Amino acid sequence: ESHALKLLDEHNQTIEPTIKSHHGRIIKHIGDAIFAEFDSPADAVDASIIFQNKFKERNSLSRREDHIQIRVGLHKGEVVVKDDDLFGNAVNIGSRIESIAPPGSIAISHEIYESLDVDLYSIRSMGHVKLKNIKSPQQVYKLYLDKNEFEAESENELQQSHIERGIDIIDPQTYEENEI
């Protein structure tokens, strides 16, 4: 248990300053997860890339049982602020996107994708995904840490990883026709 707490402390010491230095605000800790908001989507993406790369480098020098691999899910939308917390459908979508991100990676919503200068990043569509307790399928993208990582994984390999992890890719047109 003390080993797990040591890893959690290292996790927080890596993520928290990066969030703050990228115009982010930590809303709360939820177990080993951190819920944060940022001034802009680009700030959120850049912070996420930095701490994912820090964990990647750290893991390359650590024993496997000491690896820290986190999932990042980013979404942009309207929220309700109450008692220094955030609520609303946008919060739920962000949380659900995080849950489908492969360990050690970043998944972003279409709203984040549209607000970025996508030429600055390596991004591949993960397709439309039905997220738990979210009415309509969401277009989700995998944001790669660098060009090499992007080139190392084909679109087919990304789709295959969804199948292996039980993530359903949905044709939104067919889905809407079946819902009517």
Language model feature labels by segment:
Residues 143-180:
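Intrinsically disordered or compositionally simple regulatory linkers and C-terminal tails
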Residues 25-26, 65-67, 158-159:
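Juxtamembrane/interface motifs at transmembrane-helix termini
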Residues 35-145:
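Catalytic beta-strand-to-alpha-helix segment of the class III nucleotidyl cyclase homology domain
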Residues 1-47, 53-54:
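Catalytic NTP-binding/metal-coordinating core of nucleotidyl cyclase/transferase enzymes
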